[in-house]
Amino acid sequence: MTENITKAVEYHKSGFSCSAAVLNAFRDEISISEIQAMSAAKPMAGGRMIKCGAVLAAEYVLRNKYDGDTAERKISEFEQEFTERNKSVVCRELKGIDTGKILRSCRGCVSDSAGILEKLIRDNV
């Protein structure tokens, strides 16, 4: 595991929401404080949105790190890879709320989001 994946998982283990865990692990990439990261993450957490909060947090980082077309391309790549791994980016589907079949745990989504995000940032093209 890379440092940012480890950080994200540790934040989640300590009680941070999925979105707060990912945003805090990568907050230095977009020059925001922990308070700003927690504030930005709050509306994304706990199934409040359709998409998984860990996915939304990663997209927030990409949107704030890159401009226009580059951000949109990286977000598209992120969603494609996350979906290939987990079959969905939709929180209800990942948690198996309607089907009873859990596709990925919240911690797994945090780890996957952090890993994919790290790769997209590292491959700065």
Regions found by a protein language model. Give the residues of each.
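Glycine/charged-rich beta-loop-alpha catalytic/anionic-binding loops adjacent to active sites
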Residues: M1-K7, Q36-P43, E93-I97
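Active-site-proximal helix-loop elements at catalytic-domain edges
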Residues: M1-R27
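Short alpha-helical scaffolding segments that buttress acidic/His motifs in well-ordered protein cores
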Residues: V22, A40-A45, F78, S113
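Buried hydrophobic packing segments
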Residues: V22-F26, A57-K65, S113-L117
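Acidic-glycine-rich active-site phosphate/pyrophosphate-binding loop
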Residues: L23-A41, T83-C91
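Phosphate-handling active-site elements
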Residues: I30-S39, L62-E77
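Glycine/serine-rich anion-binding loops at beta->alpha junctions
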Residues: M44-Y60
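C-terminal binding/interaction regions
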Residues: D69, S76-V125
